Amino acid sequence: MEIIEAIREACGSEFPISVRLSSSEFLDGVGIRHGITLEESIRTAVACEKAGVNLINVSSGTHFTGNTIVEPTTYQQGWKLGLAAEIKKNLTIPVAATSVFRDPEFCDETLGSGAIDFVAMGRSWLADPEWGEKALSGRADDIRKCLGCMYCFETAGNALCTGEGHAQCSVNPYLGEETVYSAPTEDGNGRKAVVIGGGPAGLEAALILAQRKFDVTLMEKEDRLGGQMYLSSLPPHRG
């Protein structure tokens, strides 16, 4: 609380202060008796509001329950919204929360329900930096969705341990390389290009050619695109 009060004193009454708060560490699930619980988090959030905080940003988990912080694909959207909603009931300031938000429609439903005031997202924006723009412009179907495959988490951890590399994304090859791979040069001038095969490689080739202003024809012998990606999407809980 002293830190919050010092920030307020140094930055003034108009400066917004947000506090990230764990709603629960879920340690009872791994046999550890002591840890942050929802009841304790509610008391902390109330104290933060009294100290002058403008927003509570609710997360969860700890090192021992890492899957509740960065959830793999088996976790459903909104699975821990109830925790943030309980915290919000005790406050008058806005509450943001993480809870595996993938689809704009689900985000709208969540905000419309009044459970929280803001959705907090991370990996979805790594997968598609234009997530928000596409959602607002009615292009939700064009969003490149996070798979929940944890590859960004794995590569970020490796980079921290070795001092080399950076977080990478299974569906966004430009992540961390934005200054290296800028927008493709528009040198197609309407010339015709044919791509044979509508698997992941063919689709990416067709996309880049189209961005380069080629007149692209994509040919696929099957009645669906995606190649082997279609088969990999069939098991439950796949992105």
Question: Where are the language model's segments positioned?
Answer:
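Flavin-dependent oxidoreductase catalytic cores
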Residues: 1-196, 200-211, 215-216, 224
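N-terminal glycine-rich dinucleotide-binding loop that anchors FAD/FMN and/or NAD(P) in oxidoreductases
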Residues: 143, 147-148, 231-239
